[in-house]
């Protein structure tokens, strides 16, 4: 693949669908040890290709393969140009929509970002399209702007368009099934109206995992 190496990315701009082909790509050394990419026992992005994208606006953007490939994909985004240094990923995702990926991150108009797209499996490769578009986040997507709730009862939530923030992603108590990440998270501040033990649950009436 011509953009198999991070030193020779395909330059793209704007929003929409951008084709990719990893069928002849190899697994480079760069972008392979990112904490944000760790899922299901590995942080590797196999058989990866690279893109250099300039944001047209200051917004939260999604870079995703949902609905546009059969590849079990993995995507990582790095700020700036050139081959990324270790620990520089600002967003990474393996399975957001089935086996496909979606990374949401804050972009600044005129700034350039390096996108790494590959496979979860060492033997995975394929073709498809990468979709880039701005999204409107829920008001409590950021921990700085939580929904304020109090007392007991049922409180509605909707994380359909929520992004995965950096905060609260490496908690030892959250580690399960190979990851401690809380994907597509939203935030609440709750004031208790009682003294004693309480329980927070989504056990009834929800289909989200």
State what each model feature region is.
Residues 8, 13-14, 24-138, 145, ...:
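Acidic, Ser/Thr/Pro-rich low-complexity intrinsically disordered segments
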